[in-house]
Amino acid sequence: MRGQIDELDNQLMELLAKRMRVCREIGTYKKEHNMTIVQTNRYNEILEKRGAQASLCGMSPEFAAQIFEHIHEESVRQQLEILNQK
């Protein structure tokens, strides 16, 4: 069973890496179009949708919110790096 957990953890990391690649592409788009990095409405929409999804999957919405808050922080960090490049 530990092997299964390890494989799932690897898959999670690969998916997060893919998500961050897309976030960097979005960061480039935002830089080119003089947009702010944080889009509050979109962030709130994600938290709401993932909270509802967590409930359907037998997890607490608070758990999902914590995960996605950390994902969002890293996304913002990476997009800020792009924005600050000259």
Where are these regions (language model features)?
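Domain-level signature for soluble enzymes in the chorismate/prephenate branch of the shikimate pathway
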Residues: 1-86
